[in-house]
Amino acid sequence: MSTILDRIKAYKLEEIAARKAERPLVAVEDAARAAPAPRGFARALSTAAATGYGLIAEIKKASPSKGLIREDFDVPALARAYETGGATCLSVLTDGPSFQGADDFLRQAREAVKLPCLRKDFLYDTYQVAEARALGADCILIIMASVTDSQALELEAAASHWGMDVLVEVHSREELARAEHLKSRLIGINNRNLDTFEVSLDVTRDLARRVPEDRLIVSESGLHTPEDLADLARYGARCFLIGESLMRQADVEAATRAILADPLTAQGGV
């Protein structure tokens, strides 16, 4: 029985083949070389985490498990709201079929703010890495559940070639062990199971203590309140990727500011 991740991989491989046929790699690489210089995604998170929390705020219109998340979807306005609200970096969904994302959303977001941006997509081919840089991405995502070790190494090397950082995402002890063979300092612990889409913060509680001290932990998914962040910080997570719980708020700027507040003084959550 195929999982959601299996289905995503199937259409992504078709999409990659179609894009290669439509736009040769040399053209993508020319665009990547012409793109504005990377802004230092990992550096920004590390600096923020040294004195507080590093927040990767996500621009996400929909998801396979929840359907449409936000109807009022003005990407530049959302990016500015996140920046003003205190986000450290942005994550922008560019996958269309499952998340109603688009390449142009990344361009729009990065042009609207000064924050480093992650291209949030399912990457399997170094062509997509060059594509990410051409779009202005400062960081890419490698999901260990969806790639082989050799693919992960190739994607990471390509990102390094283009001056981008890599967020390596894991959900299990086995995936974490594999991720440790990569050079990237950023380890994303996804609290969402990509096979079932069930969410549990226990994933971060279990894995965070196993992450080498020289890595920077980013807890992802299922984060709704300042208390959630404070709880996971006790396990070593100082950076967080938050999307849906912020995207559902009418006032995204206020919601961003609220979730970063000290839980002892915060008035409720988002």
UniProtKB/Swiss-Prot annotation:
Q: Which NCBIfam families does its entry note?
A: PRK00278.1-2 (NF001370), PRK00278.1-6 (NF001373), PRK00278.2-4 (NF001377)
Record-linked InterPro entries: Aldolase_TIM, Indole-3-glycerol_P_synth, Indole-3-glycerol_P_synth_dom, Indole-3-GlycerolPSynthase_CS, RibuloseP-bd_barrel
Q: Show the catalytic activity.
A: 1-(2-carboxyphenylamino)-1-deoxy-D-ribulose 5-phosphate + H(+) = (1S,2R)-1-C-(indol-3-yl)glycerol 3-phosphate + CO2 + H2O
Q: What gene codes for this chain?
A: trpC
Q: Which organism is the protein's source?
A: Cereibacter sphaeroides (strain ATCC 17023 / DSM 158 / JCM 6121 / CCUG 31486 / LMG 2827 / NBRC 12203 / NCIMB 8253 / ATH 2.4.1.)
UniProt GO MF annotations: indole-3-glycerol-phosphate synthase activity; phosphoribosylanthranilate isomerase activity
Matching entries from PANTHER family are given as: INDOLE-3-GLYCEROL-PHOSPHATE SYNTHASE, TRYPTOPHAN BIOSYNTHESIS PROTEIN
**Biological process GO annotation list?**
L-tryptophan biosynthetic process
Reported EC number(s) for this entry are 4.1.1.48
Domain of life from the UniProt record: Bacteria
What family, per the record? Answer: Belongs to the TrpC family.
> Sorted alphabetically, which SUPFAM superfamilies does this protein's record hold?
Ribulose-phoshate binding barrel
Q: What is this protein called?
A: Indole-3-glycerol phosphate synthase
Q: Name one Pfam family in it.
A: IGPS
Q: In which pathway does it act?
A: Amino-acid biosynthesis; L-tryptophan biosynthesis; L-tryptophan from chorismate: step 4/5
- This protein's UniProt keywords: Amino-acid biosynthesis, Aromatic amino acid biosynthesis, Decarboxylase, Lyase, Tryptophan biosynthesis
